């Protein structure tokens, strides 16, 4: 497989789906390009019009195996034959414990370790904020300009990437201070290291 463009971009099928999306979906995401995914294989993504692209996004953060990796597909199929969903808050599940134990063994920190599973990075940020407040008694946070943490209210309060993401949601959680990264290659204050 290799990249191949078969239609003008976006193609006719993609344009129809994008138009339908704009009518039916909440405009809560900023999509940078008019791509409508049909399927993927490894590093390639094919749109609904048959155009093949080299996918430099390949999912968010945790899907670094590429699209449709055979081992991942097999694991999903095996699990789907048992059950599709369970809540770790309602009952226990052996595989969940095994994954938690493996993470605890491999996390390079000393002392007592425990795992908290979430559905998303935003939920992980919310949990981290709650843990920080609970264990320190403090309620202020430092976050970086240009950093993205999620779209839930707490995570959005820390997010410093796109102002449009916060539009209509003020006031956000108080006590968040945004600062620049401590890297002056492109210093926002036009300063240099001594």
Feature locations, PLM:
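Residues in well-ordered beta-strands of folded domains
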Residues: 6, 46, 180
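Glycine-rich loop-to-alpha-helix module at the N-terminal edge of alpha/beta enzyme cores
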Residues: 4-7, 52-142
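Short beta-strand-to-turn element immediately C-terminal to the catalytic PLP-Schiff-base lysine
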Residues: 46, 65-66, 157-159
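Active-site-adjacent loop/helix segments that line or gate small-molecule/cofactor pockets in enzymes
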Residues: 1-41, 91, 96
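Active-site and channel-lining beta-strand-loop segments
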Residues: 34-56
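PLP-dependent aspartate aminotransferase-fold enzymes
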Residues: 101-194
């Amino acid at each position: 497989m290799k990249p191949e463009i078969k239609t003008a971009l976006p193609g006719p099928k993609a344009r129809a789906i994008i138009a339908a999306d704009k009518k039916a979906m909440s405009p809560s995401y900023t999509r940078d390009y008019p791509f409508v995914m049909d399927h993927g294989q490894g590093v390639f993504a094919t749109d609904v019009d048959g155009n093949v692209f080299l996918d430099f996004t390949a999912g968010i953060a945790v899907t670094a195996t590429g699209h449709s990796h055979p081992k991942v597909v097999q694991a999903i199929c095996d699990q789907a034959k048992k059950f599709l969903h369970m809540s770790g808050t309602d009952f226990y599940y052996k595989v969940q414990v095994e994954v938690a134990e493996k993470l605890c063994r491999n996390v390079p920190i000393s002392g007592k370790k425990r795992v908290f599973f979430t559905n998303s990075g935003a939920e992980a940020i919310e949990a981290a904020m709650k843990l920080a407040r609970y264990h320190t008694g403090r309620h202020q946070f430092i976050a970086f300009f240009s950093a993205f943490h999620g779209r839930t209210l707490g995570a959005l309060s820390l997010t410093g990437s796109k102002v449009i993401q916060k539009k209509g949601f003020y006031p956000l959680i108080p006590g968040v201070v945004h600062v620049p990264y401590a890297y002056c290659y492109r210093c926002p204050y036009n300063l240099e290291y001594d």
